[in-house]
Amino acid sequence: MSQEPEPGAMPYSPADDPSPLDLSLGSTSRRKKRKSHDIPNSPSKHPFPDGLSEEEKQKLERRRKRNRDAARRRRRKQTDYVDKLHEACEELQRANEHLRKEIRDLRTECTSLRVQLACHEPVCPMAVPLTVTLGLLTTPHDPVPEPPICTPPPPSPDEPNAPHCSGSQPPICTPPPPDTEELCAQLCSTPPPPISTPHIIYAPGPSPLQPPICTPAPPDAEELCAQLCSTPPPPICTPHSLFCPPQPPSPEGIFPALCPVTEPCTPPSPGTVYAQLCPVGQVPLFTPSPPHPAPEPERLYARLTEDPEQDSLYSGQIYTQFPSDTQSTVWWFPGDGRP
């Protein structure tokens, strides 16, 4: 016995599924719309047809209830799925808005950096010329020419805190001329001239390209000069013991205060150092030569003439006689005002 569906029954159909318009609506409106369907044991809107027995009416009621429960479960699942999609869409919209804001900030920063780059390119010392770029494209095997090294100009004394390179003007390239480099190389490779005089060490004159070279004296000469200068000077009438032997005392014991001998007994030889002429605390820059053997020393004589009538000195005679010379030097000292 085939059973036909009752006209009052509401079987499940695809029309019960939410439409795209319902999916676009909020979850609140959808929940309000389905409240009437979610009420359990709600009375049927369609009455039973006439001519049915009680058993058939119970079967029809059970079928309607199953259909309503199945439709309710289906709508609930679909609603939960749509709610999840709606929450994911809202989260994606928030992330999209955040990304759009970040993109706007990056575009603003990119525009600012492009403006700074356009202002810096004309004065940048590291910029590669266009000819070098074209040469690299045409001849890839040639070596890359290095850009010139720019030396910023030194700051003037009026502006000690002035920067070397300003943003408005490029640095000035000042390579040294080739003639100056060659001249400096020749001057540096040339050895210093030999020292011909043992007395004074001469240094070359000042040059605009090379500072004067100061050659220190040998350490032995410095030590010897320091020792000679530290020695106290001898008396005026006695020459230095290094160059003249000690003089024998005068037999008459003439006046030491009137002795006119203030110079050494022998003429100075080249390189001779006299302690009398060396000031204390100053070391001369020359090398002394060894003392020469002195010849036989000259002799100093004195002769006094006294007046037999008076006990006073009438005249005195002091003379010096050299062994190799017969001439002598005589000094007269009159006494008592007599002619």
Curated annotation (Swiss-Prot):
Keywords: DNA-binding, G1/S host cell cycle checkpoint dysregulation by virus, Host nucleus, Host-virus interaction, Modulation of host cell apoptosis by virus, Modulation of host cell cycle by virus, Phosphoprotein, Transcription, Transcription regulation. It is found in: Host nucleus, Host nucleolus. Residues 57-120 form the bZIP domain. Residues 145-160 have a biased composition (Pro residues). Residues 57-84 are annotated as: Basic motif. The modification Phosphoserine is found at residue 42. Residues 60-77 have a biased composition (Basic residues). One of its GO terms (molecular function) is DNA-binding transcription factor activity, RNA polymerase II-specific. InterPro entries: AP-1 (IPR000837), bZIP (IPR004827), bZIP_sf (IPR046347). Functions as a DNA-binding transcription factor. Promotes transformation, host cell growth, host cell-cycle progression through G1/S phase, and possesses antiapoptotic activity. Forms functional heterodimers with host JUN. These heterodimers bind with high affinity DNA sequences called MEQ-responsive elements MERE I (TGACA/GTCA), while MEQ homodimers bind a second type of sites termed MERE II (ACACA). Both homo and heterodimerization of MEQ are required for oncogenesis. Belongs to the bZIP family. Jun subfamily. PANTHER family: ACTIVATING TRANSCRIPTION FACTOR 3-RELATED, FOS TRANSCRIPTION FACTOR-RELATED. Homodimer. Interacts with host JUN; this interaction allows MEQ to engage in host cell processes by disguising itself as a cellular JUN. This is Oncoprotein MEQ. It comes from Gallid herpesvirus 2 (strain Chicken/Md5/ATCC VR-987) (GaHV-2).
